[in-house]
Amino acid sequence: ASCKCDDDGPDVRSATFTGTVDFWNCNEGWEKCTAVYTPVASCCRKKK
């Protein structure tokens, strides 16, 4: 599932969701792109 990274923009309707929901921690080579901590899932994005 896709999720909204912090820098995708504040407007949920017009924002592009560039993150991917990952359960627990992000995969290797990916980084968490939200400041909000949720224990079950992280919003991750491939490292540039």
From Swiss-Prot:
Gene Ontology CC entries for this record? extracellular region; nematocyst
Q: What does this protein do?
A: Binds specifically to voltage-gated sodium channels (Nav), thereby delaying their inactivation during signal transduction. Its toxicity is weaker than that of RpIII (AC P08380).
**Protein name as annotated:** Delta-stichotoxin-Hmg4a
Asked whether the keyword Amino-acid biosynthesis is assigned, the reply is no
The subcellular localization recorded is: Secreted; Nematocyst
Q: Which UniProt keywords apply?
A: Disulfide bond, Ion channel impairing toxin, Nematocyst, Neurotoxin, Secreted, Toxin, Voltage-gated sodium channel impairing toxin
Any remaining note in the record?
A synonymy between H.magnifica and R.crispa is controversial.
**Species this chain originates from:** Heteractis magnifica
Main subcellular location of this protein, as a coarse class: secreted
- Please provide, alphabetically and separated by semicolons, the GO molecular function terms listed in this UniProt record: sodium channel regulator activity; toxin activity
Family (UniProt): Belongs to the sea anemone sodium channel inhibitory toxin family. Type II subfamily.
The SS bond pairs are: 3-43, 5-33, 26-44
Gene Ontology biological process terms, A to Z: regulation of signal transduction
Q: Which residues form the signal peptide?
A: none
